[in-house]
Amino acid sequence: MRRSFFFFAVLFLGLSVVCSCSKEEVPNSYPQPDVNTGDLPMGDAYITDSAYLTANHLKVYNFVYPSVDPYGEPVMLSGSITMGDDVSRGVPANGLLLYNHFTVYRADECPSRGELSTQGMATGMGLITISADYYGFGVTEHHHQAYCISLYNAQTCIDALMAAKQLLGQMGYSWDDVLFNVGYSQGGQTSMAVVALAAERYPDLNITYTIAGAGSYDLPETYRQFVDATIAGMPSTVISVMLSYNEFKNVGLSRGEMFLEPVLSHIDEWILSKKYTRPEIDAMVGSLVIGDYITPALLDTTSASSRALTAALESDNLCKGWTPRGSERIMLFHSVRDITVPVSNTQRMYDFLTSHGVQDVDLQIHDIEGTSTTPAHENASLMFGLLTLQKIRAILGISA
């Protein structure tokens, strides 16, 4: 258990794993996707590189697959398939794990660029992990990311899952009929959006268990709470949600209608350049007080600009507008001290699920504080990791 917990602790704090390569299988460094020549031509899914091994003994296959962009147009996206040395051809793996990653900003923080610390959690459990980069990373790095547009991101993850299953079969891998759907923060939101899309569009996609932590399931309510509380734990996420929904949901606001200086003059460099990490961006913003970087008009919920943004956020509200399958099995996790994603998101999701007849919902609400350097949102991810490992091991029948 200590070994697996270490992987999750590293994972959710977003630390990178150093790559070491197998002499027989791999090049001398991470394979790098082609991100400078525009979108790839449409085609079938394919493995982009020879398999390589990371320092924590993960075998990695990067792949490209067909999906859609945030406007619904065809596009090729990228992701990674990872497995421990306990998985091999000819012997069925214990199942698949769809891992939906948390908030990232720097280009090399996505799975296909080598950020695979999270995927180490599958080591020792006999699982094959599938991770989408999301639009705006990997082979679509030259585009803005569709940050926290949950239903769209879920579509890209389901497409990645389907493509990876096909590619794995072609390579001679097999697995038991078990599928875990896991994510924290933005990944928690995406995980619940995967549940929603599966219920509405993919009746044959059976999820064994979903484990979602601290996701923004009700973004309009989150927006209203930030306005009332006047602070947000990670300013970069607030800015990114506004940029993303304004662009991809056609809200039509200028940057000057959304942001104050110095953020206004540094959007391209700080956020869209993909040069910086989340902590670095938050440090450059320099304040948790949203009135220091968001315009008064957007903090006035009666203004035309605020109403337009709220309507866009409402269009992606996961706490309404779909009918969950009663057979879903879900764990929801949150800390009451979280000021990055308010705990009301998880309570509202729990109420929504149970009101629609979903009985197997394990609600995990904990009191986990932050520190002077680490927000409660990140500190709580450690407990989420431990509970996730316990849940997966119990379902698979693996002792601690």
Predicted regions and their residues:
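Short, surface-exposed "cap/lid" segments of acyl-processing enzymes
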Residues: 70-78, 82-125
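Short alpha-helix in the alpha/beta-hydrolase fold that links the catalytic acid
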Residues: 194, 328-329, 342-353
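Catalytic-loop region of hydrolases
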Residues: 21-88, 92
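Primarily recognizes the serine-hydrolase "nucleophile elbow" in alpha/beta-hydrolase
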Residues: 162-234
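Accessory cap/linker subdomain of secreted extracellular hydrolases
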Residues: 213-323
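Short beta-strand/loop motif that positions the catalytic acidic residue
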Residues: 326, 331-338
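Alpha/beta-hydrolase active-site loop
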Residues: 147-170
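C-terminal catalytic histidine-bearing segment of alpha/beta-hydrolase fold enzymes
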Residues: 305, 311-312, 340, 347-348, ...
